[in-house]
Every structure is written in structure tokens, then in C-alpha cells.
């Protein structure tokens, strides 16, 4: 193959140009993302049961839906929540690779089976089935510059004019409004109702009748008279629009003829539909919209589309309304990808300098350099063909590939240069001879490296998706690299290189010094190798000790899934004691805001707080803050990193009285949770009941708090049981008094909850009408006695006449996991520990809890557990496949052993570098380790291949052959290894956006390659001789 292209250099150029053109077109069309679709697809079912408490919602809605979600293809796990606001949410998580569209259809079909069993009020509200991510992509906040709009004005405008257009934007899965649009609020006065012998149901029924749209038909409608000349629509009644019009609704006419109007028994106003959240931006009134990504959508494209849509809508905003983005995860994605591109360029420059140092010939150096863009662009074309994106993983694969792909070209050029110098041949003839010598080695390297990375493509789950990105990228670049090394590179060598001048090349002073030093080093290396081969037994014992050290390092290196990143944003939760009011929560959130904007003013750009909302549930005692940091370029230094900021905040905010305030970083993969660290579900497997499960949870939290050196920040991601005021209705007594139980229930529900009646028109938009007790009549326990219900004889009877009240406790939010009552526990690993260590520790603590209490991992922790289970199998399969590939290539069982024995030398270097830097055995490390395995084998192949050839063609003994092969291949091995090490150096020293992942990949690979090079050049001859002697004895036996 190589000879064909040596004789046809134009054809080689044509193929290279076609590859580059295809890659250039691919880059222009490939979408950009931080990660591929790693997170498994999720489908969320949401339902509302107005006025119901959490237990009622769970019993009558959540469980009914859950029990019908059986037989769904690819369902991994299911979690659900039921809260005191009447909301039920069931999130179904499917295996990676499942079509979200098909999953959504299947869930909808199953939901239809559950519908007849659900309460009528739930069916009337409607049930949504969304395929959106559970995590927030970005938050758009809206503020009034001059304060002319209050928070309700802002929220109404956002809900009426902005929310719907954003929800229709491409890539948006769902939107969540922090605020509420206006509604017509009817605030009832129980004393006035009692005065006029009225109950809330009378008010509701009259609003329904008098605020109604009636279709009146037509005058002259078809069929019509033959001479009909008139056709017009009949308008009977339209919906009311103003508080004044509602106030005039007629409730009853008394015996004296006087009328009782709605305004006589209630205060009517235009108020908020929902008062459950209070939003602030840097302490000022605001409203906000949280954007959640549609499953499978591209984050960058969606963010751009949202901002473009808001920019379009801003032309119609009220004069003082302004949009800000207090939380946006996409700048991190853009900058981290840019950083990897920058690293790619730096790697190419460093590799060029290394090659020039060793080759000392610009013509020779330019040949491998030309191969870099050809192979990289060709790889982009393949990525486009297989449906990949430009993301952190594929770009890391490119950076690793630079060192690999120049290896092939360097081996070709270096050998051609050697043949030209030693055999005094013209470049073309030298290239023909050289390719005959190394063609098999190039194929062997390609086969081995492909064999190393191929098993990664078949792993499952989110980890498997990460492995696949690396696998396809590296294999594609490797195969293209070998193709270029056997087509374009030899063609360039034959046409660009010059014959050696008489007396050889005369290097400049720097190169002369380098060559002198290198020749001395080569001679010293040759002598050392000869000495080593005299006492191979001693060095095999040393090798075994290195293997033992490798095993120890493997056991002591902490495990995790993915490294944490400084994403430029983080969150802070605030939870007050049960029963705390919104007033108290707002004060605490203001303290949080003041801290970040004063104590961390050099690092923090903005703070957006939402009272009444949190990932642990909705409630007046819950709050959440979105903190946006200044750009990375303005936060240089470890003390200004997100980790340091969070650590300082955790200490400072812990002093806030009567509140638990907890700042936390975002997870590495947004769709796999809301916080970094571990995510555990404590399960009531034994059906012990809510109270026993709560006790077990508290015991677990107490045990965890006793070991701050293992775990920290261990907390429940839920709401504590709160005091509840229970009304016990004596049904028999009520019946005896002629009071219907349904009337009692509706009176209580309307007064202390609210009743949605129907809709009205406001500024051209349909909005809702609610009836509820006025504020003074639902604040205290005694207010229950102010309400009356009319009996069958028309007499008003107070609720106190047939009911009693008592205080009790209950949960405002109940959780379930896979159909079992559960409680979510979040936490972080202590300093110096990994999430893997923390997970193992927490699992041991759960084992100490009462029988019947179990656990399961969810979100990111679920994927980490899956990853740790797959890693040993991945290593084993890769090693076996490499061994078999070498055996097939060399038609020998002994040669593969000589090559494979070098693998632990690279592994120990990777482990040592990772351990010394305090990093973890995560997915990136595992990818780097496989790369190290391949590169270690590659160096061994370069030596062994030449030794075998000398034994077969020149009849040399194994010792003579391996010494000569080691001497000949030392220069290309050191050159390619140093090129690779310097190629990944930018990853190792990276800081800022995306540096966590870059450090994790680069450190292990660099350490592994360094050890594989320094140790392998001495140990490979030992392995070769030992294996050859053992197999020779075996054959004689």
C-alpha cells in the first residue's frame, strides 16, 4: 500500500485534501455541547389535587399513577413526590439510549389506564406528561429599573406575555415561573355571609352563572327563509372583566326586595393567582422564569434561542422592565470548549517543537505536522457521520489523539531519515525500504490501540456513553493516522526529504550539543540493557514489586464518577424550622444576599432568591438562591474558585439563627441531579411507616455527623414534619342537625384553601377567578369557629357545633422511590475523600439501621455505582483483546506476553501521578488508563517488532536482537513519548472553566506515559528475553 502512494504522491494529496474538506464541512455543521446525551431520558408526570394534603395526594393520586407504570421499556427507576400544596410529581428515568418520544407515548398510554381511578378534581385540572430534564438550564429574571412596577405587576406581565413564547422555543422542555399572573380574588367575610344566610357555595354558584360566556346563535341562521335578508350573531352574555363588575354579581334578593351583591359579603380585587413564592434580584422585587432543557436538546442552541426570543420580546416591554440572567450554565460550556480548543493548539505547537528538536530538519519536521490537521479534520468528518457532537469528551479524545497520530508519522519519518543517512539512498528508494521495515509495526500499533479502545464502545449506561465518545474519537483518529502514515507521509518523505549530504548534516551548536548528549545517553542505555540481561531474575522480582505497588495504589486511590467543576454559578438553599412563615424566610434570604454582595463582592456578580421554593419542596419555610459569579478571568487563584467561595460561605452562613443555610456546587452532569456529592434514597422496605422511617433517617444523619472526616453536609432533601391543625367532623351530629357533609367540606376547603371557579378576561388574556376567605379570617385556629354552614331547614350552624379541633404533626412532602416510601439524603465527601469513599461509608451506616430500612443510589450516584462495577470488566476485556490481537498479528503466543508485561509499568505511573495530585479514580482516569495501556504496548511493539525481524532474517540470538532493537528504536520511542507527554501537558496545568476534567484526563495519562517510557525501555528487553527462554524450554519439553 505504501509503495503505491510513494509512486503516486498527487493521489495521496488528493485523498488528504478530500478528508480535510469533509472535516471542515463537518465542523461547520456539528452541534456544540458540554457533554453528549449522557443523562438517561426522563419523563415527568405532574398532577394537582386542589386543597389536598400530602398524604391524600399520595394515597389518591401518586400511588394510583405509579401502580399503572408497569411494563415500560427500559425503565431504570421511578421517583415521586406528593406535597401539601396538592401537587403530585412522578419522574420516570429510562436507560440511556431509550427514545424519549417513545417513552413519553408509553407513559401517556399507561396514564390513560389510571385516569378513571383518579379524583374528579385531579382530572379537571389536567395531567401533564413532559420529557424535560429535571435540572434548570438557566434562569431569566425580570426587574423594574425605576421601581415603577411591583413584583406582582412584573410577574403578571411575564406570565401573560413571556412565559408562553419561551415554552414554545426550540429545545425548551418546560418553564417554571417564579411569580404569578393576576387572578380575580374574591375574599370572603364569614360574618357578612352569616348575616345574609349565605355560604361559600352560594357565591361560587352565582359567579359560575353570571360570569359565563354563552353562545347565543344567529339571527337568520341556516336553514333560512327564501327571502331572508338578515344574518347576525346573537350575544347573550360575556365574561366579566373588572373587580367592579364582579362586585355587582347578584347573590340573592331578600324578602324586602333588597339585593345582596358580591361586594356586600366579600372584597373583590385583582391579585396574584399564587402567593407561594417571593422572588428578589440583588434584594429588589423581581419575577423569574426557570428554563428546563428538553430531553436530547442542545443546551447552547436552546440558550441562544431563549435569549434571541427575549431580545425580540423586549421591544414590547414596559419602559422600566429589564431582563437579566442570574443563573446560566451555558457560558461554562462555551468557555470550557474554547479552553479545550486552545489546549489542542498548544499541544500541536509543543509536539512540533519536540519533533524539530529530535529530527533537527525542518523538512522532516513539517511532514508529521501536516499529518495533524489531516487526521483531526478527518476525525471530525467521522464524528459527524456517526451523529456525535463537538463536546468536552470528543475534544479530549482529539488532544490525546495528537500524541498518538504524530507517533505514526514520526516513526515513518525518523526511519526514512535513518535509512537515508545509514544506507546513503535517495529519498524515494529510502522510503520504499523504510516502509518495508516498519509497515508491519504501524499496523500492529493500530491494531493494538484500536483493540484497547474498542471494548469501551460496548459499555452501558451514562458511563458507557462517555466511554463511547472517547472510543470512537480515538479509534477513528488512530485508523486515519495509520492510513495517512502509509499514504501521505511516505509520499511526502519521497518528495520533500533530501538525500544526505557528504559528511552528513551539520547541526547547529544547540543541536550538536543535544546530539552529543543523546549519543552518550544511548550508549549508556545500551550498556545498561546488556547488564540487565545478565541478571533478568533480579529485575523480574523488581517488576513483581512494582506490580504489588500498583495493586496497593489501586486500592488506596479514591473513586468518583466525574470531577467537580467551577461552572461560574452555584446555589444556596435555606430551610427554616417547620411552621416558619414567608416573612421569616424572606429575611433569611436577604441575609444570604447581603453576605454574597458584600463579603464576596469581588467574586459574586448577582444573587437571585426565591422564597417558598426549593429542590426539597415548596413551602413557606423553604428558600433557594442562585449565585452568579464573575468571569473566570476576574477570579484568578484557588481562593477565588467556586469551591473556596462555597467553603467560606458555609462557615459564614451557618451563624444565621433558626435556619439551615447550605451552599452547594452543581453536579458535573446537570441532568443527573441538583447538587454535587452523593444522592441516596433511604427506603422503607419493611413498610414500617412514615414515623419509623423518619426516626431511621434521623439516626442516619446523627451517625454521619459523628464522622466529619468521612462525610460532610449530610442532609435530607425534603421537608420536616410540620404542625397541622386537624378538624374532626362528627358526621352523626352534623347529620342530626341537617348539615350535609359535602357542604362542610366545601366551606372549609374554600375558606382555608381556595376554590377555582372559572375564568375572566384581563387585557385580552383569559385568567382565573378564585374564592377564598379574607386574610383576617384564616390566620388563627379560632377562625374556624367563625364559619357557618346552612342546614336543610335554612338555618346557619357554626362549624364548632358539630366539629372539634386538635394539633397534630404530618409531612408537607412525601417521597417514594420505585413505589416504596423513601427519603432522599444528600451529602458531600469530606476533604481528602472521594464520593466513592463517601458512598461506601454511607452504605455501611445504613446497615446499622433497624431491619426493614434499605437504600438505593439515584442520579449521579447511581451512575457512579454502575461505573465502578463496569471498570474491572473494561480493563480485563481490553487486555484480553490486545493480547489476542497481538497473537494474531505475530502468529505467536510468546510475543504478546513480551508486550503485555509492560502494561503495569504504565499503570503504576498513572496511579502514582493521580494519587500525588489528590485526584480520584474516575471515568476520565479510566479512559486515561486505557490510553496508557495502549501507549505502553506501542513502545514495546516498536522494540519487539525489530528484535523478532532480526532473529528471523539475520539469525541473531534473542539477547543480541533485543539489544540492537532497543538501541535502534530508542530515539523514536523517546521522541514520540516526549511529544505525547508535552501534548497533554496543557491539560495537566489547565485552570479555570473545565479544568477539573482536563486535569483528570491529563494527569493520569502523563504520569502513565512517563513511567511507561522510563521503565519500559529497560524492562521490555528483560521481558523479551525471559519470555523467549521460557517458551523455548516449553517447546523442548
From Swiss-Prot:
Pfam families: ACR_tran. This is Multidrug resistance protein MdtF. Residues 31-338, 391-392, 463-471, 556-870, 914-927, 994-1006 are periplasmic. Residues 1-9, 360-369, 414-441, 493-534, 892, 949-972, 1028-1037 are cytoplasmic. One of its GO terms (molecular function) is xenobiotic transmembrane transporter activity. The gene is mdtF. InterPro entries: AcrB_DN_DC_subdom (IPR027463), Acrflvin-R (IPR001036), MdtF-like (IPR004764). It is found in: Cell inner membrane. GO terms for biological process: response to antibiotic. It is a multi-pass membrane protein. Homotrimer. Part of the tripartite efflux system MdtEF-TolC, which is composed of an inner membrane transporter, MdtF, a membrane fusion protein, MdtE, and an outer membrane component, TolC. The complex forms a large protein conduit and can translocate molecules across both the inner and outer membranes. Part of the tripartite efflux system MdtEF-TolC, which confers resistance to various compounds. GO terms for cellular component: plasma membrane. The keyword Repeat does not apply. Its main location: membrane. SUPFAM superfamilies: Multidrug efflux transporter AcrB pore domain, PN1, PN2, PC1 and PC2 subdomains, Multidrug efflux transporter AcrB TolC docking domain, DN and DC subdomains, Multidrug efflux transporter AcrB transmembrane domain. Belongs to the resistance-nodulation-cell division (RND) (TC 2.A.6) family. The chain crosses the membrane at residues 10-30, 339-359, 370-390, 393-413, 442-462, 472-492, 535-555, 871-891, 893-913, 928-948, 973-993, 1007-1027. Keywords: Antibiotic resistance, Cell inner membrane, Cell membrane, Membrane, Transmembrane, Transmembrane helix, Transport.
